[in-house]
Amino acid sequence: MKEFFLTPQKPAFGEITEKRSKFIAEIRPVCDEKEATAFIEEVRSKHRDARHTVFSYLLIDGKRRYSDDGEPSGTAGAPITEILEKKDFCNCALTVTRYFGGILLGTGGLLRAYSAAATNAIEQCDPVKMTLKSRFSLRCEYTFYNRIPSILSKYGGKILDSDFSNTVSLSVSLPPEHAKTFFDLIFELSGGKILANQLDPLYEKE
């Protein structure tokens, strides 16, 4: 899994004009293909008179898709995907809509124009960094609970959820590189009485 990725904190726009053709880019955070597809259809509906609306989306689960939407192959969808990848963006969808200005741009001109509009939008999106964290469930007696928060904090971790009943149940996260040290320490301190299970990892906002 990726150690981190960037994703837009908010929708953002970019626009350029090249030989009377207008290129309007929009980037938005998305969590899954359903959100990405809905966003793309929303943009196409908004710009129904435009000649082309190309797009790219990348998801942290590995799903990805792009389209040139009728432009020459390799001049639109692939270049904006490459820009997103080089800038470490994920969980986002990016569209670039073209209103044709009557002058052909050629493959090189199209590639430069779509790339410039996409970059313009990306630069306005106020990205947030999402970092991979290990996640665990803990169960312990109350006598051991008071030690856990300070040890977690020492290793860059935090409590995500807690339940206090006959025993204490916690969901915690911490950087993967500190997970073994943390668990070796609490195992030693509790004499093996803190029960731990590894859960699916997650990404947390920096």
PLM features per residue range, with description:
Residues V172, H178-T181:
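Terminal, non-globular segments
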Residues R139-G157:
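Short amphipathic alpha-helix segments
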Residues M1-G74, L195, D200-E206:
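C-terminal regulatory domains involved in ligand/effector binding and gene-expression control
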Residues R44, L84-F89, S115, T119-D126, ...:
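Signal for well-folded cores of large energy- and translation-related assemblies
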